[in-house]
Amino acid sequence: MSVEVSNESGFDVSEVELVSVARFVIIKMDVNPAAELSMVLLDTAAMADLHMRWMDLPGPTDVMSFPMDEFEPGGRPDAAEPGPSMLGDIVLCPEFAAQQAAAEGHSLGHELALLTIHGVLHLLGYDHGEPDEEKEMFALQGRLLEEWVAEQVRAYQHDRQNEKDCRLLYKSGYFGYL
């Protein structure tokens, strides 16, 4: 699986986290592991231009998705067997996302993870134009975000425990006997 990130926004964001959450969603949604995804981070002026050009809406937005191939997403009950493909592009605007994060009382990292999930789901065919679609998509993106955060916490705790174990083994002189 290939996830490429191009940060043209001038904002300092964790590209590692963006790749991590995108990969997590792709795996959870049962997309072929050979799938490719491109992510671009833009400043507000560039995002406003893109928003006007593609959606005919003024001003910047937080996330836009541009599917490359038309296919049924994996992970849905009615989906065909997923195959390798270029999923498409997700365009994020960190500056706009930072404003949303502040308004919601959470971190920029949290907001960008949520927007990445939202963007991937759009690439997989999910939409929120109708109330039922919105309910399904937003519930799924909330669940995926919770699961990704829980996985990150477990990985962090595992790493801290490994560090403690290694320090203890070095202090005990255990490694001197190997």
Swiss-Prot record:
PROSITE patterns: UPF0054
Subcellular location: Cytoplasm
Molecular-function GO term, any one: metalloendopeptidase activity
Superkingdom classification of source: Bacteria
Record flagged with keyword Zinc: yes
Main location class: cytoplasm
Nuclease as UniProt keyword: yes
InterPro entries listed in its UniProt record: MetalPrtase_cat_dom_sf_prd, YbeY, YbeY_CS
Matching HAMAP family: Endoribonucl_YbeY
Protein name: Endoribonuclease YbeY
Native source species: Mycobacterium leprae (strain TN)
Gene that encodes the chain: ybeY
